[in-house]
Amino acid sequence: MEKTVIGVVHLLPLPGSPEHTDLSAVIDKAVKDARAIEEGGADALILENYGDKPFLKEVGKETVAAMTVIACEVKRDVSIGLGINVLRNDAVAALAIAKAVNADFVRVNQLFFTSVSPEGILEGKAGEVMRYKKLVDCRAMIFADIAVKHAVHFASLEDYCLNAERSLADAVILTGKTTGGEVSLEELKYAKKTLKMPVLAGSGVNAENAARILKWCDGVIVGTYIKRGGLVDAERVRRIVRAAKG
């Protein structure tokens, strides 16, 4: 089975966030990064409001509007799959954007169970999320993090895996403890053996470890490694793709 490679477009600060300066600059960089991800041969990309530190658990209308505009511009420019992640945990906002731009998937950091993060308590709201998805007839798949990075978890990996299918997620994502931190191979192995749905590695993947990681999952989401000097580098994307697909 061919493995999936998803590149991350880390957006510059958006309107309403403390460090925002110029929306046109955000759009320009997002489009350039998206082009590089496509040029490098990745299967899809995901837009993430990574510059909006410190994050809100649920974002304002200005963030939804800005990300929708950016997603439209990116979708006009590239033809690979498109995903949306609204940090820190706004799945409804992500689905609203995905519906508007016909995105292929959304990422949800805490779809079920509860964790403690720097932004406060992240409460899983799978029931609300899935009902909203039905309400707006959004066809985007939902990729749910389990034991997501930058958070303290009280549920075990076993608990997450036992309850993943009840959340109606289409796939799950495992990460390391921090952005760029390598995911545990033992945790990947356990999830892959336990779950029937696709399992993705969501952090710490590089050209050197990609093949090893992909033995135990169905795809990778790569953000930190593919950047050089703050911009996505198509050659670094190619290295990941070669490692993933041979």
Swiss-Prot record:
PANTHER family referenced in this protein's UniProt entry, alphabetically: SGC REGION PROTEIN SGCQ-RELATED (PTHR21381:SF3), ZGC:162297 (PTHR21381)
Do you know which Pfam families this protein is assigned to? Answer: BtpA (PF03437)
Q: Which family does it belong to?
A: Belongs to the BtpA family.
Q: Which InterPro entries does the entry link to?
A: Aldolase_TIM, BtpA, RibuloseP-bd_barrel
Protein name according to UniProt: Uncharacterized protein AF_0419
**Organism of derivation:** Archaeoglobus fulgidus (strain ATCC 49558 / DSM 4304 / JCM 9628 / NBRC 100126 / VC-16)
